[in-house]
Regions:
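Hydrophobic anchor residue at the start of the ABC signature
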Residues: 75, 103
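Charged, flexible cofactor/metal-binding loops and thiol motifs
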Residues: 52, 148-191
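A short, surface-exposed alpha-helical micro-motif characterized by mixed small hydrophobic
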Residues: 128-130
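A short, proline-enriched helix->beta-strand linker immediately N-terminal to the Walker B motif
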Residues: 80-84
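Conserved ABC ATPase signature
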Residues: 60-65, 69
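Conserved ABC ATPase "signature" region
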Residues: 37-56, 165-166
Length: 191
């Protein structure tokens, strides 16, 4: 019931296997369904992640796909097992900015449609705000703050969270950023 989507679609897909082989692998390993059922499941999951028509993708190899298409294959490989919980290790950080939002929207829609929950690991607070209902901030390998997304971003408590939020660049120079009184000595003492 637990699966993972890796950060780098260029490294997480076997370059010697076709897209069909890559997505079939978990079904084959766990001996799920017969050959026809497995083939049908692969076609359906490709449609689900927006790789249509599926027959155009099945015989191809990862190097023949764009970064966004590769990440869709990674998502398909993960979801073919019908997990309830997916660990997402920065699944959009290796993608072109123009593709990121479409992958994030796909993941959000799939979470609703397939009733999947994500643990979304990211260093990008803008992505966390877009993707997450709750955020946990880690400092030195420990969770130091957990809150609803907007609550954490608007009213951080831990000094590291405050420092992290204060470091986010603001594209509008006339924007007045909320200034946090950060005690750097206190933060350094936590290290």
């Amino acid at each position: 019931n637990i699966q993972m989507i890796f950060q780098d679609p260029y490294e997480s897909l076997n370059p010697r296997w076709t897209i069909e082989d890559i997505i079939l692998e978990p079904l084959n390993i766990h001996n799920i369904g017969n050959l026809d059922e497995r083939g049908d499941a692969v076609v359906e999951i490709l449609k689900t992640v927006g790789l249509t028509p599926p027959e155009n993708y099945l015989p191809r190899y990862p190097h023949e796909l764009s970064g966004g298409q590769r990440q869709r294959v990674s998502i398909a490989r993960t979801l073919i097992m019908k997990p309830k919980f997916v660990v997402c290790d920065e699944p959009t950080s290796m993608l072109d900015v123009s593709i990121r939002i479409s992958i994030m929207d796909l993941m959000l829609n799939l979470a609703k449609d397939l009733e999947v929950s994500y643990l979304y690991i990211t260093h990008d607070l803008a992505v966390a705000r877009y993707m997450c209902n709750r955020i946990a901030v880690m400092f030195n390998g420990k969770i130091v703050e957990i809150a609803e997304t907007e609550e954490l971003l608007n009213n951080p408590i831990h000094p590291y969270t405050k420092r992290l939020i204060s470091s986010i660049p603001v594209p509008d120079p006339s924007y007045e950023r909320k200034v946090y009184d950060i005690n750097f000595d206190e933060l350094d003492s936590l290290i």
